[in-house]
Amino acid sequence: MANLQNYIEYSREVQQARENNQPIVALESTIISHGMPYPQNVEMATTVEQIIRNNGAIPATIAIIDGKIKIGLESEDLEILATNKDVAKVSRRDLAEIVAMKRIGATTVATTMICAAMAGIQFFVTGGIGGVHKGAEHTMDISADLEELSKTNVTVICAGAKSILDLPKTMEYLETKGVPVIGYQTNELPAFFTRESGVKLTSSVETPERLADIHLTKQQLNLEGGIVVANPIPYEHALSKAYIEAIINEAVVEAENQGIKGKDATPFLLGKIVEKTNGKSLAANIKLVENNAALGAKIAVAVNKLL
């Protein structure tokens, strides 16, 4: 463990929270570097961090900078991540290389889970998890996020899986891997920009306290892997299912025609969707992350009270 700590650097705020046993909530950084244009990405990141504070927890945005896994970013780190043109998108397979080469890296859902677990952080807020891509039966394009959820003990609060994915297959994969997917005040898997996907959930809860109970019980039973808390985008910010599906289908065709696949597919598709919705999808994306941040903080606080 001593060697591991050589690679981890805590922000002042996060270090203080650790010393005071305050609840901490992790945030990913790919949404900053690859998910949104500047300066909206910085505004979104600072707003989301503040929402977590307002709900009683401490935010820890995670990124790789100069050979260090940063747990919590100072404002200068955030600027580097938001404006640098050479930020690598880091998943599990890339983590050692990016750290060793002292490059700047933004963490995906999978890597944020890994780094959060290294730092003893049990909760992580994101927009949407990755999953099984459309046509995966031919391409085998399945996000490493799903595999990570099966083995890393972090509870992930999200608005379901990104709506560009094959959601029924994503749920089948999570079921095979034994990952609980729990709807928050919903019986249907939310689909990122929309509240409905047509995919029913077997588990649903009404309060953060109930989620805290489940999280702690799972830990005490030594069950390996994470939990997905599926928190739908608020009604007033949701886009209609038919509208967004038509746009996604157009974007998928464009990606195929241009030969864009693998880790480049998601940023390309999300960028195209922003363009085709005239920015409506970007506004929805920001609102759903803010909504997840509030819930994530409430769950972390509820768990802290039970310890």
Give the ranges of each region predicted by the language model.
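General beta-strand structural signal in soluble alpha/beta enzymes
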Residues: 25-27, 60-64, 105, 123-128, ...
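Divalent-metal (Mg2+/Mn2+/Ca2+)-assisted nucleotide/phosphate chemistry catalytic cores
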Residues: 74-153
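Active-site glycine-rich loop that binds ribose-phosphate moieties when present
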Residues: 106-108, 137-150, 154-175, 208-213
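Anionic-ligand binding region
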Residues: 195-220
